[in-house]
Amino acid sequence: MKTTKATESFTAEEREAMKERAREAKAASSKADGLNDLLAKIAEMPEPDRSMAERVHAIVVAAAPDLAPRTWYGMPAYAKDGKTICFFQAASKFKVRYSTFGFQPDAMVDDGSMWPVAYALTELAAADEARIAELVKKAVS
């Protein structure tokens, strides 16, 4: 039976995301450093990801100013008590056709016995922005 190395199971993008997460865990930076890291990652994104990430950032900060901005697997994220609540993943990160706005298990987005924890974004209309703000407020309630 042929064996493969574990690294062959992951794409180059996935391996880079894991390396970024390891660097983030080592840094365990303050809220100010987290914001600077997040803004730097957004600035590195190609368009249209950058514009979308900037808008999502503004929405999250306005909806839940107590969340701590940071990076998570090299992407913008927002934490409460050190635990990631929500995140933005640029389409360019894994070379897919849509960006993702998602929630982690500590987000209070429960809705009955089944609910979405991630949303595909191809653009942001006013209704989408309002929905993201509503979801973020619910997530931290």
Regions found by a protein language model. Give the residues of each.
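Charge-dense, helix-prone N-terminal extensions
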Residues: M1-S141
